[in-house]
From Swiss-Prot:
E.C. no: 4.1.1.48
Tagged with keyword Amino-acid biosynthesis: yes
Protein name listed in UniProt: Indole-3-glycerol phosphate synthase
Keyword tRNA processing appears in the UniProt entry: no
Reactions that this protein is recorded to catalyse: 1-(2-carboxyphenylamino)-1-deoxy-D-ribulose 5-phosphate + H(+) = (1S,2R)-1-C-(indol-3-yl)glycerol 3-phosphate + CO2 + H2O
Name of the gene this protein is made from: trpC
Record SUPFAM superfamilies: Ribulose-phoshate binding barrel
Swiss-Prot/TrEMBL keywords: Amino-acid biosynthesis, Aromatic amino acid biosynthesis, Decarboxylase, Lyase, Tryptophan biosynthesis
Any one GO molecular-function label of the UniProt entry: phosphoribosylanthranilate isomerase activity
InterPro entries found in the cross-reference section: Aldolase_TIM (IPR013785), Indole-3-glycerol_P_synth (IPR045186), Indole-3-glycerol_P_synth_dom (IPR013798), Indole-3-GlycerolPSynthase_CS (IPR001468), RibuloseP-bd_barrel (IPR011060)
Amino acid sequence: MPRFLNGWLTDVVQASLSRPKIEKVRDRPIFSLKKSIISAKNSGLNPIIAEYKRRSPSGINVDINIIEYVKFMENNGATGISVLTEEKFFNGSYNDLELVAKNVKLPILMKDFVVSEKQIDSAYNIGADVILLIAKILTERELVSLYKYAKSYGLEAIVEISDEEDLDVALRGNYDFIGVNARNLESLEVSLDRTKKLLQMIPKDRLKIAESGISTRQDIEELRASGADAFLIGTSLLKDQNKIKELI
């Protein structure tokens, strides 16, 4: 069982533990997010992971065509696609992930509260290339174990942090990426200043992804100056898809 949690995180973890494994034969190759980010950076672009979510703490509640959205992002230079699959609080689904996997040739992140191996089985089977492991909801032993399990499939993993305690845990492992979430998962408050501070504490040889609260070119430039290698953006792109042309 994941570490002791409070409030809505307890509910979301319990819901995650009870989700069934999706039995399906994967029908797409694995696309590397790491290679995609490095390629974008070498081309002088801002590597943007465009996120699709139906609902979130930011207040967004969208019903736009998922296939049209992700193909627009792919055609306009997105480095990867993130798909929210958590059901209870974000109204996501594995079906959303499957739709994206069938329609883009970009690395796909299954954005969820991963706490069990069967969720990783499902991610691989459906067609994800990357999973999210949130340090805040896992013990360090669980984090290491789930990371190794994901790697056994050839998947990449983002270890997400939101404070210095999480950062200490993330730096003890040789993980593919460290994602810095501007949103505090307990209070749901967003602080890009905290993101910048944490980014500056991460060694330069680690690939770092800034997550949440990003809406302007200036946000990206400031985060990049603090050490971010890539930017996971959802709400602002869902509200205005053309914004990717400005941010890229």
